[in-house]
Amino acid sequence: MGLTTPAWNINNTVVNGSNNTEHFSCVSKFNTLNFLTVIIAMFGLAGNAIVLWLLAFHLPRNAFSVYVCNLACADFLQLCTQILGSLECFLQLNRRHTFFLTVVFMFAYLAGLCMIAAISVERSLSVMWPIWYHCQRPRHTSSIMCALLWAFCLLLNFLLGEGCGLLFSDPKYYFCITCALITTALIILLTVVPSVSSLALLVKMICGSHRIPVTRFYVTIALTLVVFIFLGLPFGIYSSFLIMFKEFQSIFSYHVLEVTIFLSCVNSCANPIIYFLVGSIRQHRLQWQSLKLLLQRAMQDTPEEDSGERVPSQRSGELESV
């Protein structure tokens, strides 16, 4: 069966006759796209590393920053696998290593999507039921949820890799299809749930009897979700369909998968840009200050006063221990 291996592995079969030119052209386009992926991923690694460093060591920890920190970690891991995968293509290294990178890439991809969904749902809960959220919510919920989400994604991708012959055993067709169906359903669910919760929250903010002011953090999460839908979601859906339906491999060019991988790379790089951009907007204009202050503003879940910034509330910060 045809497996959805990443576009990091080129078929080295020599093509005779008139197909030589076409084969060379495909390889040239492939290398160009992967070169762009490496360049963009390097910038993304730097951005996510800065976010991780600031959230882990320089900013007070709260319920939402824990999720954002884990999202940055997932993006960092995903970008690392993309860079290594592109280098494997250039060096023509072991195909088995490429399969392993495929599993790690999907693991990081799903983990990042889980973090986005968790942030969006928890943000909606904090607005819809504020009394329960601030009084009854157990401590360390964010840390426990992140650990469970990482473990779940690791287990699911291990089963997917084993069933599809990407790790240690031969492919098992029906088991592989089953895992692919579960993965596809999970991707769709994790996209629909935060979209609906964010839309419901927006309606409550605009049309509710007690209007809730829009905070920077809501804007940050909304932009992150929108960017993922347009840039990150195509890879998850398309790669899953490649596993489940062989017809996709003949109908669509393999370069479509390469493009979706590239878009996923751009998505992982965009998140730090969103954080710092939202943090830099003040009184309808950009004000560039220290990265620490910009990130702190982007994580701010309290409304701003007309005269200036409010100090972020410590109540949400007390939900998690440092």
Swiss-Prot record:
GO cellular component: membrane
Transmembrane residue ranges: 35-55, 71-91, 99-119, 148-168, 173-193, 217-237, 261-281
Principal subcellular localisation of the protein: membrane
Keyword Transmembrane included in the entry's annotation: yes
Membrane topology: Multi-pass membrane protein
Role description: Orphan receptor. Probably involved in the function of nociceptive neurons. May regulate nociceptor function and/or development, including the sensation or modulation of pain.
Protein's name according to its UniProt entry: Mas-related G-protein coupled receptor member B5
